[in-house]
Structure formats: structure tokens, C-alpha cells
Design a protein with these regions (language model features):
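EAL-family c-di-GMP phosphodiesterase catalytic domain
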Residues: 4-11, 30-44, 57-166
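Short helix-capping segments at alpha-helix termini
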Residues: 23-28, 54-57
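A short, hydrophobic coiled-coil helix within the histidine kinase transmitter core
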Residues: 16-20
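Conserved functional hotspot residues or short segments at active or partner-binding sites
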Residues: 50
Length: 166
């Protein structure tokens, strides 16, 4: 679920979100909230407060589009993120520029040492997939594997996927 800066700065976010979760019998551990680096700059203290409370309830946080915003590593490491989603622009630039590729290698190493799960977005072909695996990403996302699906199509999509695996 994508979160905006105004949602994350809402003093009532925890209570409102937990009411929705509880009324729909959803386990908080199944919820993933995505936010971009820029979403953290409205009211940083309130954003961190909300993230910590939600994280304690079991909700996980993904930092989306890493590498395209302000990339303040001190703030990122000080926030309760579980997963860092590297933006596709880093992937594309890495394949054409060895300096960018080296930076991605170092970043993945540092984030892994800190216990983050790493995901890369925008993988569209085998070269990009191989590169992402070689760099140590835990998850790969992109059109090579699946295109975004309307909710109404998800059951059919997963049924086909299950048949293909069986």
C-alpha cells in the first residue's frame, strides 16, 4: 500500500489503520506500507512515531524508489524500514556505467549488513535479472515476471501461476 506524506503525518494514522485492519480481520503482519524518501520530510518526527507504532504491530515498511530522492542514509538507517526498493533508474544506469554499478554494489553490501531486505524494480529482461541476482538483491520486480494487474484479475492470474508451477 502506497502512503503519502500527509497520511504518514496524520496523528490518528495508527488508530485509523488498526480499526480498518481489525474490522476486516486482516493480520497486520500481512500489510506492507510503501513510502518514498520525500514522504518523510513533512513532519519527520510524526512520521517516525507512526512508523514505529505500526512496525510494533507487525506492519512492515518498504522504502520505495530508493536512489531518486534525497537519499539521506542517516535518516534511512534510523527509520524502521524492513525493505529497500531500488528504483529502476539505478538498474538501467548500472548496466551502462561501471561507476554506478560499483556504487550499487557497495550500497547493497551496506544495506545487507544492516539487515535490510533488498528489492530492485524495473527488471524487463534476462540481462537485468542476472545483474540483479549478481548484486545480491533478495527480490526482483518488473515486467519480465509480471505486469501490474487489476485486482479483479488476480485470482485468475494466481490460478494460472499455480497450474504452471504444478
Amino acid at each position: 500500500i502506497n502512503c503519502s506524506s500527509s497520511e504518514l503525518s496524520n496523528r490518528n494514522l495508527f488508530d485509523e489503520l488498526m480499526a480498518i485492519i481489525n474490522s476486516n480481520n486482516i493480520m497486520p503482519e500481512h500489510i506492507r506500507l510503501e513510502l518514498t524518501e520525500s514522504a518523510m520530510f513533512d513532519d519527520f518526527n510524526m512520521v517516525i512515531h507512526n512508523m514505529e507504532k505500526l512496525n510494533e504491530s507487525g506492519i512492515k515498511f518498504y522504502l520505495d524508489d530508493f536512489g531518486t530522492g534525497y537519499s539521506n542514509l542517516e535518516r534511512i538507517i534510523g527509520c524502521p524500514f524492513n525493505t529497500i526498493k531500488f528504483d529502476k533508474t539505478l538498474l538501467y544506469k548500472s548496466l551502462d556505467n561501471s561507476a554506478v554499478s560499483d556504487i550499487v554494489s557497495h550500497l547493497t553490501s551496506v544495506f545487507k549488513e544492516q539487515g535490510f531486505v533488498l528489492l530492485i524494480e524495473g527488471v524487463e529482461n534476462e540481462e537485468q535479472a542476472s545483474y540483479s541476482i549478481d548484486k545480491g538483491f533478495d527480490y526482483i520486480q518488473g515486467y519480465k515476471y509480471a505486469k501490474p494487474q487489476p485486482v479483479i484479475n488476480l485470482k485468475d492470474y494466481f490460478d494460472k501461476l499455480e497450474r504452471a508451477i504444478s
